[in-house]
């Protein structure tokens, strides 16, 4: 049994919680409130911005064979920011000005500390688990979302074939790396996999419950402006992951 298959079996209750989360089911069924979805958009926009330095921190540790794929991820994440900006403008949501929630902030710090302080294989495990969780989550939404829903572009981005190809590539690479590690190293990777799934569940919970920071009024919770990784609002017509998928298909690796 592959490393990922073992992890999926071991943590199947967490995968069930992710795929059955009310946020996803309500988005699929068209019953999610505009306010709840706007909360998710603002927080995930901050998360995608933070994912850029996460990937950048992995690059110096990565094997040469992964340089191209990680560079492609950086480009795709920038396009995802455009997607958020385009959708927010379409539905009248202001992305800027919302401080990170407690869960968003904690998840970002988990990403960055893993990338900077842990071996590459552990950071790559977190990358795979997070991307796989998003693919599986939006596949749930894809099963029943109305074609005219304003959230269809998010479904197309994360449930589409290009992103699926990227996630499959990450999975194959992770299984390959795991075969070259010790049992102790694999157990550390498994623990980070578990924590990533827990953070994914917590992120949906945060958005669905409009979570702030525990113990304080929200006007005390933080800054009124986030980082500006991507001020350009232009957006191309294709999936953010199309360029990377083409590189994987044409070269056998990204």
Predicted regions and their residues:
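Short alpha-helical hairpin
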Residues: 8-32, 51, 169-180
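Alpha-helical bundle segments that constitute or directly flank the non-heme di-iron/ferroxidase center
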Residues: 12-17, 31-61, 125-135, 204
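Active-site-proximal alpha-helical scaffolds that flank and shape metal-associated catalytic sites
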Residues: 42, 65-165, 194, 198
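Non-transmembrane amphipathic alpha-helical segments
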Residues: 52-55, 84, 138, 170
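Long amphipathic all-alpha helical oligomerization modules
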Residues: 163-194
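Acidic, carboxylate-rich catalytic segments that either coordinate divalent cations
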Residues: 190-219
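Intrinsically disordered, low-complexity terminal tails and inter-domain linkers enriched
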Residues: 214-253
């Amino acid at each position: 049994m592959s490393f990922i298959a073992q992890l999926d079996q071991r943590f199947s209750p967490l995968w069930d919680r992710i795929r059955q989360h009310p946020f996803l089911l309500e988005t699929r069924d068209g019953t999610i409130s505009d306010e709840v979805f706007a909360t998710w958009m603002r927080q995930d926009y901050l998360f995608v911005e933070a994912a850029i330095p996460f990937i950048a921190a992995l690059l110096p540790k990565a094997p040469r064979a992964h340089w191209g794929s990680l560079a492609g991820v950086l480009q795709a994440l920038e396009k995802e920011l455009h997607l958020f900006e385009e959708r927010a403008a379409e539905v009248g949501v202001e992305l800027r000005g919302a401080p990170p929630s407690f869960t968003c902030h904690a998840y970002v710090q988990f990403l960055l500390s893993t990338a900077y302080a842990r071996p590459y294989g552990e950071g790559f495990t977190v990358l795979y688990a997070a991307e796989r969780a998003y693919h599986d989550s939006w596949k749930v939404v894809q099963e029943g979302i109305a074609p005219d829903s304003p959230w269809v572009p998010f479904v197309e981005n994360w449930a589409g074939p290009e992103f699926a190809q990227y996630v499959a590539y990450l999975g194959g690479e992770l299984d390959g790396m795991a075969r070259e590690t010790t049992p102790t190293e694999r157990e550390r990777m498994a623990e980070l996999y578990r924590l990533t799934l827990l953070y994914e569940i917590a992120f949906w919970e945060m958005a669905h419950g409009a979570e702030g920071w525990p113990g304080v009024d929200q006007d005390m919770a933080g800054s009124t402006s986030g980082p500006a990784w991507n001020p350009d609002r232009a957006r191309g017509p294709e999936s953010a992951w199309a360029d990377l998928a083409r590189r994987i298909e044409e070269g056998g690796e990204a």
